[in-house]
Amino acid sequence: MSPNRQSQIKVTDDQLKIFLNCSEVFNACDSEDIDFILSQIKTYHYDNETVIAHREDVGDQIRFVIKGSLNIVATSLDGKEVRFPPIGPNRWVGWISCFDIQALSHDWVATSNSDILVIPGTAIRKLCTKNPDLYPKIMAEINRQFKLLMSWTEFVSLHSLSARACMLIHILAQISATPMDNKPGWLQVDVTQEHLASFLNLSRQTANKLLVGLEKDGFINIGYRKILINTAYLNR
């Protein structure tokens, strides 16, 4: 994994406004507020997998994934690495860090060939001071992510391995996947078999056996550094 190597890239205001529209928080802002946010945005490209925020750093910013994904990576005292399901394209993350000065307990890792948009927490707090009606919308964003985390914790702790694997696919569909234009009804998640095993906190052999079972059921297709999810199975 590379150290924090990044290159700043330029994105047009029209493109940035499209990204802002992916959050109900910014949809509630007037044009003056949007212009202010546009002035605060920075966008970065990462050629290689890169740690962009270290545990013990203070977060104080929100991020939007334009391309690639963001991973939460935790490391135990004995050096064991555990990854949580990644944040995929067209999704915002990090709202709670704008109002919490505690240091991170994990690393944020950008996958290779990722483009990530960043807005400082000071800008978000300034928006909320001007327009307190934004607080409930931000709380809704935080609550949505918290509920997913609690669901994942429940399945890892209480349910069978097969149920855990199935729940992982549901979570990936919500926070990681992108629709496939050339294959309607399917979603794509760019992820390695090694990382899937890490999400499940299982050996690669055990995780692969579970995923092959889901593939036989028609729920997913396993490819090279990716899985495809059949949306017809998500509501079953």
Question: How does the language model describe each region?
Answer:
Residues 1-48, 97-98:
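Cyclic nucleotide-binding regulatory module and flanking cytosolic helices
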Residues 33, 83-147, 151:
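Cyclic-nucleotide recognition modules
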Residues 129-199:
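Polybasic "coupling" helices that flank or enter modular domains
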Residues 49, 60-73, 89-90:
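Glycine- and acidic-residue-biased ligand/ion/polar-headgroup-sensing regions
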Residues 52-58:
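Short phosphate-coordinating micro-motif centered on Lys-Gly-acidic
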